Design a protein with these regions (language model features):
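Secondary-structure end/capping motifs
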Residues: 242-323
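Conserved C-terminal helix/tail region of periplasmic/extracytoplasmic solute-binding proteins
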Residues: 313-356
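Second-shell loop/turn segments in exported
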Residues: 55-57, 150-153, 192-196, 239-241, ...
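Pocket-lining segment of extracytoplasmic ligand-binding domains
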Residues: 186-278
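N-terminal secretory signal peptides that target proteins for export/translocation
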Residues: 1-13
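Bacterial N-terminal signal peptides
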Residues: 15-30
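Short, glycine-/small- and polar/acidic-enriched structural segments
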Residues: 37-183, 187-190, 197-203, 218-222, ...
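Sec/Tat signal peptide C-region and signal peptidase I cleavage site
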Residues: 31-36
């Protein structure tokens, strides 16, 4: 904006601007109006454990690390301890949530099967992965009899579920392929070594796979295969929500602010992501650009009734959820808490065309 004024008017304007800036406690870019407001000093830091569903995490899973390392958690009086699990559907991850030991990722299937917990923040509604295959695989039909990944929880885990969906496109069933369980860190090495013929990989691993072994290729993007699937949400035990709802709301607010910072502050978050993922910076930067361009991370609550209900119906169709135990949207998601957290973060917004 260009101002035209007499010299005296400009002097008054300059003094006004200086006074205004001096009154602000800090200026924060892109993490919500609430963060830029003056906060009272913390009476005490609340120690909270956060579960991350992959060890080491993929780029998409790093908002928890960003919130800790940028001091966003600290501004909300949260002292975060991060625990890495072998899959969001793993017994250890679900037990940590059930027992109120950690806030971690949970899905609709676990809730329908009896997990007494609710989702409170949708970290990444959209699927970021691609199904990567060996050079000899040209179509999904070629996966018959091949070795497919079941990392992240084995049968019922994420890679197993995605492999099942890919097989279905060729009229195949899970018994038509060999599913191989391993640690989540073994996904890319297994494909590179020829131990696997198919695996769902995150963008940074797709980049590294094609760089190290150009014959490997993407069979299908999972967002293309399942455009309405809800990918990743954090949840808390009902006992925790009942006992310390304000704490969970503060966590959700901090994480909404974090995802907004991720979209707006690439130069600050990339080093944090490199450290957390243990991946080369070029691969992390590639993944970051893909995730931002495709609006994988949320910028608001991240919740979508359409995606959640579609995921429930898909699980019923596949036999993962019994039809008579079908959960409602409100049984899966604590909508009110999400709305309260969003309001505290400054309300709804859109960043780079993303608005989930």
């Amino acid at each position: 904006m260009i101002f035209r004024s007499h010299r005296s008017g400009l002097a008054l304007l300059a003094r006004a601007v200086i006074t205004l800036l001096a009154a602000l406690p800090w200026v924060v870019c892109g993490i919500g109006a609430a963060t830029a407001q003056s906060k009272a000093p913390c009476k005490e830091m609340r120690k909270i454990k956060f579960g991350v569903s992959v060890s080491p995490p993929n780029v998409v899973h790093t908002p928890i690390y960003v919130a800790r390392d940028l001091g966003i958690f600290a501004r909300h009086c949260i002292d975060a301890e991060i625990i890495e699990f072998e899959g969001g559907a793993s017994a250890a991850n679900l037990a940590a949530v059930t027992q109120g030991q950690a806030l971690a990722t949970i899905n609709t299937t676990a809730i329908a099967q009896g997990l007494k917990a609710k989702q409170f923040w949708g970290m990444a509604p959209r699927l970021p992965q691609a199904y990567m295959v060996s050079e000899d695989i040209k179509t999904a039909a070629d996966l018959k009899g091949k070795r497919l990944s079941a990392t992240g929880g084995g049968v019922g885990g994420f890679n197993w579920v995605m492999g099942r969906e890919v097989l279905k496109t060729a009229g195949l069933k899970v018994d038509d392929a060999q599913f191989v369980s391993s640690a989540t860190a073994g996904r890319l090495p297994g494909l590179l070594a020829g131990q696997l013929n198919g695996v769902a990989l995150h963008p940074e691993d797709v980049y590294l796979a094609q760089k190290k072994k150009p014959g490997l290729h993407v069979l299908v993007g999972l967002a293309e295969l399942m455009p309405k699937y809800f990918f990743n949400a954090y949840g808390a035990a009902e006992s925790v929500l009942g006992k310390d709802r304000a704490m969970v709301r503060d966590v959700a607010t901090a994480l909404i602010e974090t995802n907004r910072a991720i979209y707006n502050q690439k130069e600050k978050v990339i080093p944090i992501m490199v450290e957390a993922t243990k991946k080369p910076q070029d691969a992390v930067s590639f993944s970051y650009d893909y995730l931002v361009k495709n609006c994988v991370w949320s910028v608001n609550t991240g919740f979508s009734k359409e995606r959640t209900e579609w995921s429930i119906e898909n699980a019923i169709e596949n036999g993962d959820i019994q039809a008579d135990k079908k959960p409602t949207y409100d049984q899966v998601v604590d909508v009110k808490l999400g709305e309260e957290a969003l309001k505290a973060a400054g309300g709804p917004t859109k960043i780079k065309g993303c608005s989930d």
